[in-house]
Design a protein with these regions (language model features):
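Zn-dependent metallopeptidase/amidohydrolase metal-coordination segment
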Residues: 65-120
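A short beta-alpha structural unit
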Residues: 3-11, 31-51, 72, 78
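A generic structural signal for well-ordered alpha-helical segments
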Residues: 26, 58-59
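Oxyanion-binding "anion nests"
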Residues: 1-3, 14, 18
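Aromatic-rich carbohydrate-recognition surfaces in CAZymes
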Residues: 122-125
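Helix C-cap/helix->beta junction micro-motif
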Residues: 29, 61-62
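Short amphipathic alpha-helices in soluble, non-transmembrane regions
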Residues: 16-26
Length: 125
């Protein structure tokens, strides 16, 4: 039996702790564990210039303040940030339900909204 587990976290040390726990549990069952393909952690900069631009653009275009949240998962920003330290970046996107499961769904109207928002942001830059 082979079990694949992609550990992800916004905090690198927490991801490593989780890997140690997984390793310990499988070791107690007499199994071996090998980790690969891991995403590096990424901590968003809440004082980011691009975040300020996008918040203003969203407010201007939609008449409400955007909902800015930090999620616990590792993101592609971790990979980019590892290769380009100090880059001002942000992660945003449409509404997705049940990610990484057979029931994963995207709310189609939010895809169009975020595409329009991306274009408006690029114009604002």
């Amino acid at each position: 039996v082979t079990v694949y587990c992609l550990t992800r976290s916004s905090v690198e040390s927490r991801k490593e702790e989780l890997q140690e726990i997984i390793q310990s549990v499988f070791a107690m069952a007499g199994a071996e564990v090998e980790f690969s393909g891991s995403y590096p952690g990424w901590k968003p900069n809440l004082k980011s210039h691009i975040l300020d631009v996008m918040k203003t653009t969203y407010q201007t275009n939609y008449g409400v303040e955007p909902r800015v949240i930090i999620i616990h998962a590792g993101l592609e920003c971790g990979i980019i940030g590892r290769n380009y330290p100090g880059m001002d970046m942000i992660s945003f996107g449409p509404t997705i339900k049940y990610p990484h499961s057979p029931d994963e769904r995207v709310n189609i109207p939010t895809v169009a909204k975020f595409y329009e928002f991306l274009l408006a942001t690029l114009k604002a830059l």
